[in-house]
């Protein structure tokens, strides 16, 4: 009997943590672990997919196994993290530090911390003194953080429930008409264009909410019991106000969980193997390699979820952003040259630039998102949460709670859900 994907993931985590705590940066033992890691990853990749008929969370853990393997290899070999530099000589302290890295994909609080991390809300960071009762409880940044995380995650669960309900509750004949094979590439009518715009908007709003739920619950619990502090967990996503360019969309607004491992591999290829100097060629090749790796990770998730015809569209979606970056960079360069200013200078036309930029990003996403998403939308059975409040209270009732909840979170907890 073959070990489960979960068992293999725990094995990778355990071995990697022990090696990280007990070996140095250039230890030969780390390199001998590489073929073992490849074998384990092969077993994970060739395990049969889980049953996809239950809900959207099924397979989520298995879907991260490939990324986890890539991150372990990055930490041990490519980046070569040495916890002796950070934790002194105590084996216990080195092991504690080593256990953090597999869960710290953004390198928070280390010298490997990625760029453009969002900052914690002032609601969490501000000090409150001399209060009693509930106010005294809330004077602790730790508990304010936990309460805020749990409250926002509950709101996001309901929002994701609404989004998946909108995508799921479509008659079969309409589903095939709108999302059928080959429909993802180009709309053939105004009605299909309308559906394309609606599906893209609902998908990204829903995915953003869904992607944060498990993280917020886990970080709330870890912080509430004192294992971590709020400063260990900068916001998972940045501000939507930064998403007026494609680079801002991926580099400042969207989550950065893949950034460190994937850029480590792309930099290894471009700078250490190909010996490229910093140049436009090196930059765009790095972009292409990062998006190609991201595409492969998400194709694996497709397989886990039982999506049989989405591999080409998924890869095309991610690779398309290289062309988008190229076009965006050159148009911005021409614009700055026309107004004789550097990229660091603030333009008097900043509002126009952001409006045009937001329209550009929305248009690009509307074109390419269905390439990736429509094969998922053809599988209505998995487009649901473990428990649907929409099925119980109705769409209008759930939507009312979402709007009221958003206002309450903003006013009471200074949250931007």
Curated annotation (Swiss-Prot):
One of its GO terms (molecular function) is O-acyltransferase activity. GO terms for biological process: lipid metabolic process. Its main location: membrane. Keywords: Acyltransferase, Membrane, Signal, Transferase, Transmembrane, Transmembrane helix. Residues 1-24 form the signal peptide. Its EC number is 2.3.1.-. Belongs to the wax synthase family. This is Acetyltransferase nanB. The lineage of its organism: Eukaryota, Fungi, Dikarya, Ascomycota, Pezizomycotina. The gene is nanB.
């Amino acid at each position: 009997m073959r070990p489960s994907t979960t068992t293999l993931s725990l094995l990778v985590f355990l071995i990697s943590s022990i090696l990280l705590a007990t070996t140095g940066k250039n230890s030969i033992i780390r390199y001998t672990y590489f073929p073992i890691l490849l074998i384990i990853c092969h077993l994970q990749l060739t395990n049969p997919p889980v049953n996809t008929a239950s809900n959207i969370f099924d397979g989520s853990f298995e879907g991260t196994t490939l990324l986890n393997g890539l991150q372990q290899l990055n930490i041990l070999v490519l980046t070569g993290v040495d916890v002796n530099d950070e934790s002194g000589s105590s084996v216990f302290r080195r092991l504690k530090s080593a256990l953090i890295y597999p869960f710290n994909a953004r390198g928070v609080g280390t010298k490997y911390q990625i760029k453009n991390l969002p900052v914690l809300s002032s609601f969490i960071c501000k000090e409150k003194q001399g209060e009693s009762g509930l106010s005294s409880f809330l004077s602790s940044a730790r508990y304010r953080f936990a309460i805020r995380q749990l409250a926002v995650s509950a709101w996001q669960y309901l929002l994701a429930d609404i989004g998946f309900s909108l995508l799921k509750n479509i008659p079969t004949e309409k589903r095939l008409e709108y999302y059928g094979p080959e429909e993802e590439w180009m709309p053939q009518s105004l009605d299909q264009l309308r559906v394309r715009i609606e599906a893209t908007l609902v998908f990204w709003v829903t995915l953003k909410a869904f992607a944060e739920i498990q993280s917020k619950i886990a970080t709330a619990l870890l912080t509430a019991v004192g294992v971590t502090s709020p400063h260990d967990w900068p916001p998972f996503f940045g501000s939507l106000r930064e998403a007026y360019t494609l680079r801002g969309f991926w580099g400042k607004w969207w989550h950065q969980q893949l950034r460190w491992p994937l850029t480590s591999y792309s930099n290894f290829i471009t700078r250490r193997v190909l010996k490229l100097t910093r140049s436009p060629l090196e930059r765009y090749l790095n972009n292409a390699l990062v998006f190609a790796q991201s595409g492969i990770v998400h194709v694996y998730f497709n397989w886990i979820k039982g999506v049989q015809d989405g591999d080409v569209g998924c890869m095309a979606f991610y690779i398309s952003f290289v062309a988008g970056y190229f076009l965006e960079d050159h148009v911005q360069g021409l614009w700055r040259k026309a107004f004789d200013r550097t990229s660091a200078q603030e333009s008097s036309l900043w509002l126009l630039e952001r409006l045009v930029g937001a329209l550009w990003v929305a248009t690009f996403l509307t074109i390419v998102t269905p390439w990736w998403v429509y094969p998922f939308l053809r599988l209505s059975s998995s487009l649901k949460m473990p428990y649907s409040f929409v099925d119980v209270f109705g769409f209008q009732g759930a939507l009312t709670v979402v709007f009221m909840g958003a206002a309450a979170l903003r006013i009471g907890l200074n949250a931007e859900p």
